[in-house]
Structures are given as structure tokens and as C-alpha cells.
From Swiss-Prot:
InterPro entries: QueA, QueA_dom1, QueA_dom2, QueA_sf. The keyword Transferase applies. This is S-adenosylmethionine:tRNA ribosyltransferase-isomerase. Pfam families: Queuosine_synth. The gene is queA. Keywords: Cytoplasm, Queuosine biosynthesis, S-adenosyl-L-methionine, Transferase. GO terms for biological process: queuosine biosynthetic process; tRNA wobble guanine modification. Pathway: tRNA modification; tRNA-queuosine biosynthesis. Monomer.
């Protein structure tokens, strides 16, 4: 399967660089189990879900992971904290005119807080902060909004690039689980009133989510690693949902990857799991848990487009995307949503 099989033309003006005034005011394109698409508003999910269905949401929180700084010589640098190893050490991306070497001292924030480059881990730098990382990020960091916004993070992003249900204790992502950004408290309450249940997994989203696929044959692509947790409480609800004939609805590709990683770790069995995942889902993958997926519109030739193509199929997804472009849906993180049903075979 070739990378070019997942290409499509997207006019630049359809990239949503700011959120709508109301979270749940976005549009929804439903791709059903027969491969037919239907136009809706996002709030229509109340009518598209059944009593007893289960929403699975990712409760991670986005860090203000981007830090501006400088070298001892004064040259500008930028640090993106990818993963904290302990309260003062992290794997980081560093942008600089020349790659810093082990032992280099850098300074971040307006108060020039010292950090030391301790070495490398694969394509990342091991960076030791002279103070606890999270307070430094909270005071001096910026939310790492996606590169295709072509702008710096603004005040509106502080609220709108976080989900309303994030767990403050789980602050470790460098990108939002964006399908969840469509849910506000009012919509969640209405779903609850209908009898749609909800549960949580955690997947801390890494910067690798924005990395392009660089191999022509997609099966040669190596996925980035992300930490996830699928607790027993969530598994119990999934098993009960399936036992009564209801649907498990993953909210976002991150929730999907967490759930399917747990199943793959147990040979396809639905069971709890915590660990690092590099799962790469593309057409031909057999889903073990996910019946339906709420997701945003994804970049051409991205691993996320490949994932959604595995749930329906590539032809149906690209036809739906072509319709979305013609009908001027808004794309990417602050854009509109899709509801994709597992294709009937």
C-alpha cells in the first residue's frame, strides 16, 4: 500500500486555525456502516447514539510544552518537552541553529532558568532542568498548537485546546485529543440523560502525531511511541456494553489506539493494559474493540488518515473527504468532525 494512496487536495482556506465560538457548534459528517455519508451537526450525535452505547474518551491534559530560550552565547533556541522522565528531566526536541552537544547549558524563560543537555535518546535530547519542569512550563511555556495553524498560541487556545473533561493530574500531552474538543458540558449532560455511558482511557499525545510518513510503502513506516493506560474499570464497561449488543464509540484516534493497543497486548482479548504503544493501524487491520469512531478530518498522507481508512475503507474515506472539501467542511484540530462506523462486510 503506497503513501500516495492517501493523498487528497485540500484548499488552504479550509484549515480551521481558530475554534468556533461554541465547542459543539461544529458540523458532523457521518460515514455509516454501508459506506454512505450523511451531513449533520455535531449535536446530532444525541440521535445517532443508542441508550446503552459507551463513549470512550481520552482524559489527558496538554502541557504548555513549548519554551523559548537561548544559549550561553545568546543564540535563540526553542525547547519542546516531549516526555517527562521525572520531575526535572525530560526527553525534548530542541530547535537551534546548531544542534547542542551533551553538556551544553541553555537558558529558558524570562528569568533565564538553566537547563543542561545530558545526551540523546533516539531523535530526542535528554534535558535536565534546574527546577521542577511543570511549574517552569506553567509560568513560561506556550501551548504547542499544531504547526499548520501558522501562528503563535493565543489566550483563546488556553481554554479551547484542552478538553472540558481533562484530568489535571494527567498533564503530559503535547497535542490535544482533538475529537474531544467538540464536547461541552451541555452536550455531555444530554448524552448522559439519554443513557449513553462514558468512560476514560489515557494516552499522552506526543509530537510524533504531526510527523509525516517518509516511506513510499506505508508498511515500512515506524510509529512514534506514546504512553497509554486502559484501566480495568473501562474494560468492565466495554465488556458489559458488548454483552448487551451496544456499540463502543471511541472519541478520537488516541482513544482508538489506546483501546486497540490493550487488545493487541493480550492477543486480541479485551483486557486492561498500561504501557508504551507504537501501534500502527492501517487498512487490513481487524478492530478488536472499537465499533464507531468520532474523529476530525486529518492531513493528507497521515497515519491518522490511514487509521480511519482501516475502520471503513480507503475509497469510502476519500469519497467522504472529497464531499467535505466540496461542502466546505473545516479541517484539522479546530475543524469539523466525522462519525465513522465500522464497515459491514
Amino acid at each position: 500500500m503506497q503513501l500516495s494512496d492517501f493523498s487528497f487536495e485540500l484548499p488552504d482556506e479550509l484549515i480551521a486555525r481558530y475554534p468556533l465560538e461554541t465547542r459543539s457548534a461544529s458540523r458532523l459528517l457521518h460515514l455509516d456502516a454501508k459506506g454512505q455519508y450523511h451531513d449533520h451537526m455535531f449535536t446530532d450525535i444525541i440521535d445517532l447514539f443508542e441508550e446503552g452505547d459507551l463513549l470512550v474518551l481520552n482524559d489527558t491534559k496538554v502541557m504548555k510544552a513549548r519554551l523559548k530560550g537561548k544559549r550561553a552565547t545568546g543564540g535563540a533556541i526553542e525547547i519542546l518537552v516531549e516526555r517527562m522522565l521525572n520531575h526535572t528531566t525530560a526527553y525534548c526536541h530542541i530547535k537551534a541553529s546548531n544542534s547542542p552537544k551533551a553538556g551544553a547549558e541553555l537558558f529558558v524563560g524570562a528569568d533565564n532558568i538553566p537547563v543542561i543537555v545530558r545526551g540523546r535518546h533516539e531523535n530526542l535530547f535528554v534535558v535536565e532542568f534546574s527546577q521542577p519542569i511543570l511549574p517552569v512550563l506553567e509560568q513560561y511555556g506556550q501551548l504547542p498548537i499544531p504547526p499548520y495553524f501558522n501562528r503563535e498560541a493565543e489566550e483563546i487556545d488556553t481554554e479551547r485546546y484542552q478538553t472540558v473533561f481533562h484530568n489535571p493530574e494527567k498533564i503530559a500531552s503535547v497535542a490535544a485529543p482533538t475529537a474531544s474538543l467538540h464536547f461541552d458540558e451541555e452536550l455531555l449532560a444530554k448524552l448522559d440523560q439519554k443513557g449513553v455511558k462514558k468512560t476514560f482511557v489515557t494516552l499522552h499525545v506526543g509530537a510524533g502525531t504531526f510527523m509525516p510518513v517518509r516511506t513510499d510503502d506505508i508498511t515500512n513506516h515506524v510509529m512514534h511511541s506514546e504512553w497509554c493506560d486502559v484501566p480495568q474499570e473501562t474494560i468492565d464497561l466495554i465488556l458489559a456494553t458488548k454483552a448487551r449488543g451496544n456499540k463502543v464509540i471511541a472519541v478520537g484516534t488516541t482513544a482508538t489506539r489506546a483501546l486497540e493497543s490493550a487488545a493487541q497486548a493480550h492477543g486480541g482479548k479485551i483486557a486492561a493494559w498500561t504501557g508504551d504503544t507504537q501501534i500502527f493501524i492501517y487498512p487490513g487491520y481487524e478492530f478488536c474493540i472499537v465499533d464507531r469512531l468520532i474523529t476530525n478530518f486529518h492531513l493528507p498522507e497521515s497515519t491518522l488518515l490511514m487509521l480511519v481508512s482501516a475502520l471503513s475503507n480507503r475509497e469510502n474515506i476519500l469519497a467522504a473527504y472529497e464531499h467535505a472539501v466540496k461542502d466546505r467542511y473545516r479541517f484539522f484540530s479546530y475543524g469539523d468532525a466525522m462519525l465513522i462506523d465500522k464497515l459491514e462486510v
